Curated annotation (Swiss-Prot):
It catalyses: Hydrolyzes single-stranded DNA or mismatched double-stranded DNA and polynucleotides, releasing free uracil. This is Uracil-DNA glycosylase 2. Belongs to the uracil-DNA glycosylase (UDG) superfamily. UNG family. One of its GO terms (cellular component) is cytoplasm. It is found in: Cytoplasm. It comes from Listeria monocytogenes serovar 1/2a (strain ATCC BAA-679 / EGD-e). The active site is at residue 64.
Length: 224
């Protein structure tokens, strides 16, 4: 039984009993027993544990977890403390510096965002070590699409930050005019210079929240 410890429990309890999810669970059980899989089994749902449904103000969609040792801990783009900052996150920090003059921190631990209502959600929540996208198409996308659809139903305004073609596919799930979405290429070094750098998504997000009477996000990640 999955316990998230907040309002997601009630919202997702039926989903965790759906046939596709039970099949996914069996797949994961075998994968964790026979392969090296990230993140740690107890960290898979950290994004939902740290950001209750009622608190969601911003959603930053990722693809699947980092597949290097010690990196992934259940939140998109975030890495555990003491781990080198991955290139995509370095570009996010650079854009934050240029956009809002945030200092570039010495870590990639994004829990301070999650605790303010930024849901850091990957569309696939697990991955085999060293094999990007290895758990794609096993059922995670059905669950995370459902999560996006539930957030779409919120009365309070939410900003969706969709970076890269995978994330942009989710635009079709966003039908509530109270919300907004900002899109760009992925912050990866392969594409960041083609439109992510200079997108000003962070100031635009805060502007949208403030216009709707919602407290803006403090995007400054403290150095440790």
């Amino acid at each position: 039984m999955i316990k998230l410890g907040n309002d997601w429990d009630e919202l997702l309890k039926n989903e965790f009993n759906q046939p596709y999810y039970l099949t996914l669970r069996q797949f994961l059980k075998k994968e964790y027993q026979t392969k090296k899989v990230f993140p740690d089994m107890y960290d898979i749902f950290n994004a939902l544990k740290h950001t209750a449904y009622k608190d969601v103000k911003v959603v930053i969609l990722g693809q699947d977890p980092y597949h290097g040792p010690g990196q992934a801990h259940g939140l998109s783009f975030s890495v555990q403390q003491g781990v080198q900052i991955p290139p995509s996150l370095q570009n996010i920090y650079l854009e934050l510096h240029n956009d809002l003059n945030c200092e570039i921190p010495n870590n990639g631990y994004l829990i301070p965002w999650a605790d303010q209502g930024v849901l850091l959600l990957n569309t696939v929540l697990t991955v085999r070590a060293g094999q990007a996208n290895s758990h794609r198409g096993q059922g995670w996308e059905i669950l995370t699409n459902h999560i996006i659809e539930i957030i779409n139903q919120k009365e309070e305004p939410v900003v969706f930050l969709l970076w890269g073609s995978n994330a942009k596919e989710k635009l079709q799930l966003l039908t509530n005019p109270k919300h907004t979405a900002f899109t760009s290429v992925h912050p990866s070094p392969l594409s960041a210079s083609r439109g992510f750098m200079g997108c000003k998504h962070f100031s635009k997000t805060n502007q949208f929240l403030e216009q709707n009477g919602v407290k803006p996000i403090d995007w400054q990640i403290p150095s440790i």
